[in-house]
Amino acid sequence: MIPKKINFMIQKQSYMKESSRQNFLKTISHRQPDRVVVDFGATPVTGIHVLVVEKLREYYGLEKRPVKVIEPYQMLGEIDMELVDAMDIDVIGLSGENNMFGIPNKDWTAHRTFWGQEVLLPGNFNCTYNSNGDMLIHPEGDTTVPPSAMMPKSGYFFDALDRQQPIDDSVLKVEDNLEEFALVTEHDLNYWKTRVEEIQSLSKAVIANPGGTALGDIALVPAVGLKHPRGIRGVEEWYISTLTREDFIKEVYDRETDIAIDNLKKLYSVIGNKIDVVYICGADFGTQNSTFCSPETFSRVWLPYYKKVNDWIHQNTQWKTFKHSCGAVETLMDLFIEAGFDIINPVQINAAGMDPQLLKKKYGDRIVFWGGGADTQGVFAFGTPEQVKEQVKRQCDILNKNGGFVFNTVHNIQANVPFENVVAMLGALKEL
């Protein structure tokens, strides 16, 4: 029998550990959290490659078994509740039933990767191989249609294949670029209701990624989940079209925005405020040294539509809104804020103008920085464990002051990062 005093201490410690969501709500309200809030794996842009997930399970002494690949496009591994607890993760992510290839994440079956790891992939994950031995994946797992993405035999994730058909502007229709922006069904709503109810008792913050709000996310433009995508689907063609076919692009965004708000209304009707954040868009506006467009172009082509979605969310829910954009986007930060985004990710600290001290000083009381904790293109990938620890602590000191910060690396943790650097990062977080 456990003595009452010890039992009380256990209960008290357990209660204190259940403060993830409360701590999260502090930091996104720009109040100083009790500790740094941590996310690994809650979104498709804050995830961990399946190879590293397997190493983490081994590091923490968890059951040895194949890891589920919850997003095959980037080969992101599932961060299950065992790892959430082991890594002191504060945020849980929810995504739709289908992955980016239009394949339901269910009926998991074992596959062996090019690098020799046994993983679990959805049952309808049907692939073929080209003459070089590269892996080809087909939309919805249908091998009777052309493949939509390829993983080189020396690679660790998929790249979209260019399926752009010749464009005749005289017959180009807005509907051609709306095929993937369908209204949610009762099946979809029941799925979301069930998933949200499953995690209500976990005392974790929740970010939902329902899809359908992307507005030009270049990762989604090729539509790797559609069997025969129509319209403008080439990456280069899309970027050019924002200038040469501006009226067409704006009409696409206008229609997408109306569909998105209709879907968000229906989603809110079944899950209410049981989530904390909604992932809106992953459209990248930055390169390593500059932006893809001027502030004037952003204000004209994107801002009105983002603002319409964000305004509906803020006027009708308690959700915060999440915007991902890689690159040197400091010159667009005020416009992201004007558009109503509450959160910016991944905070690419090695890009031009993205000095964390500057960002925190100029924008830290108006937008939450979700990321920027370790430079995945620099120290995290190529430095020593000591350098990684030093960088993590420095970034947290800067970005976590007065809240407004959720720790994550600059984008996903890749397969070939030295694992000792992953351990160093986790160790630094423990020492804060």
Can you name each region flagged by the protein language model?
Residues 6-58, 62-69, 151, 155-432:
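Active-site loop segments of alpha/beta catalytic cores
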Residues 76-95:
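Catalytic domains of carbohydrate-active enzymes, especially glycoside hydrolases
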Residues 93-109, 211-215:
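Short, glycine/charge-rich beta-strand/loop segments that flank catalytic centers
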